[in-house]
């Protein structure tokens, strides 16, 4: 609704420390500053945006990074103190001296290979053999997959499908596995739905639907 983003000024402004510079942290910092609070935002990395910035590295998605640029301008206008490359542990947070602390550090991807579609397997058999990477690690170029890659598209959204598209455009031979009836199943209500699957097919990706990964050897997978 119009005016829904307007904030009433606080009658007793406080100092606030916000830890984490992803989109959630940026919005929390903006909202608090709009209400008149004195806000310091600490981000462990060298840039604001968190995982959202990685999403902007996927093909045809660079425009979403305009949101991060907008937040940076808003925080500057609202005089939010932004500290990059600033990791804060519990002791540092406790001694910072802020009236209020907001934690917006997000979460890390699981390292077990757990699949909701195969809930009886708490961990992917063979994951200790290595060469299993998160989408975040791939997009951040912290992981370097080989020529042939299996992508598990369990959530059916941009995280899996967009990362697969990036890998395919980089020349990798892809097999995309999903427990759903189609790749990117949760994107059916968006304009990207059909064009995404068509582009992946054009790039030679193989689709394996209504399936999961039963076992990983380090070089090959057993698919149900």
Located regions from the model:
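N-terminal Rossmann-like FAD-binding beta1-loop-alpha1 element of flavoenzymes
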Residues: 16-40, 160-168
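Predominantly flavin-linked oxidoreductase catalytic cores and closely associated redox partners
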Residues: 149-174
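A Rossmann-like FAD-binding core segment of flavoenzymes
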Residues: 65-111, 127-128, 134-140, 144-147, ...
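Beta1/beta-strand and adjacent pyrophosphate-binding region of the FAD-binding site
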Residues: 11-24, 145-157
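Glycine-rich FAD pyrophosphate-binding loop
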Residues: 37-51, 172-184
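Conserved hydrophobic helix-helix packing surfaces used for dimerization/oligomerization
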Residues: 16, 39, 132, 149-150, ...
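Glycine/Thr-rich phosphate-binding loops of Rossmann-like dinucleotide-binding domains
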Residues: 110-113, 118, 159-160, 184-185
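A short, basic/flexible loop-to-alpha-helix module at the beginning of a structural domain
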Residues: 1-16, 133-147
């Amino acid at each position: 609704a119009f005016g829904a983003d307007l904030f009433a000024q606080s009658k007793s402004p406080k100092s606030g420390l916000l830890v984490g510079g992803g989109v959630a942290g940026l919005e929390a910092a903006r909202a608090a500053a709009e209400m008149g609070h004195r806000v310091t935002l600490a981000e462990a990395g060298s840039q604001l945006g968190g995982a959202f910035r990685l999403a902007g590295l996927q093909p045809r998605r660079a425009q979403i990074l305009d949101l991060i640029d907008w937040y940076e301008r808003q925080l500057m206008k609202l005089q939010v103190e932004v500290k990059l490359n600033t990791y804060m542990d519990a002791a540092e947070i406790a001694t910072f001296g802020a009236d209020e602390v907001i934690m917006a550090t997000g979460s890390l991807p699981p390292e077990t290979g757990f699949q909701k579609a195969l809930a009886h397997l708490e961990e992917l058999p063979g994951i200790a053999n290595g060469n299993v990477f998160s989408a975040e690690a791939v997009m951040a170029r912290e992981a370097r997959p080989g020529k042939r890659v299996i992508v598990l598209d369990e959530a059916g959204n941009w995280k899996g499908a967009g990362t697969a598209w990036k890998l395919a455009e980089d020349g990798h031979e892809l097999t995309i596995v999903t427990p759903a009836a189609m790749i990117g199943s949760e994107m059916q209500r968006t304009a990207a739905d059909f064009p995404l699957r068509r582009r992946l097919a054009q790039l030679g990706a193989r689709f394996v639907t209504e399936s999961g990964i039963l076992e990983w050897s380090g070089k090959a997978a057993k698919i149900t």
